[in-house]
Amino acid sequence: MMKRANSNRERKDAMFRITFIAACWVVIFSAVAQAQDEKIPVLEVRVEGIRIAKKGEVGVAVFNSRLGYPTHLEHAYETEWTGVEEGKEAVETVFDSLPAGEYAVSVLHDENGNRSLERSKLGFPKEGVGFSNDQKVKLSAPKFDKCKFHLSLGENKKIIVRLNYRED
């Protein structure tokens, strides 16, 4: 009878140890995951200067390389579209899953909803466009290197992009 009591006690002790170790691992993994989440940078893009009389969507594209910048959205690291509300001259978009690195932002006010930049016969934008670092369209769209900025671990960066419309 004594042997059986010891056996039960040993099982209880073993179960306690296993449960304790499992709980410790859960706490450790939770702390590591939380620490990693806190390091993820956040980029807030405020787009200003939307023409109130225009409808459509505002597309904010974040590029992490020169490839496709600024108009080939299929090469953007991440793109968010926001509907234009009547009477609003600004929209805000938050990107909270970007790794640290160099980025450049391009913005399109897609007035006709085709998610593509309409151009004149001379190649100039017919819809509102804007770029990070307040770069403007001159004879051509600004280059990635002129528009780029750095996003660091744990940083909460807010940038303002002002839309420019070509006067017809």
What positions do the PLM features span?
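Acidic, glycine-anchored loop motifs typical of Ca2+
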Residues: 111-118
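Sec/Tat signal peptide C-region and signal peptidase I cleavage site
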Residues: 31-35
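Beta-strand signatures of extracellular beta-sandwich domains
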Residues: 59-63, 106
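Short, flexible loop/turn segments at beta-strand junctions in immunoglobulin-like
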Residues: 49, 95-97
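Bacterial N-terminal signal peptides
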Residues: 19-30
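Extracellular beta-sheet/turn segments enriched in Thr/Pro/Gly and aliphatic residues
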Residues: 44, 128-167
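A short, amphipathic beta-strand motif
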Residues: 41-50, 60
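A short tyrosine-centered beta-strand micro-motif
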Residues: 101-107
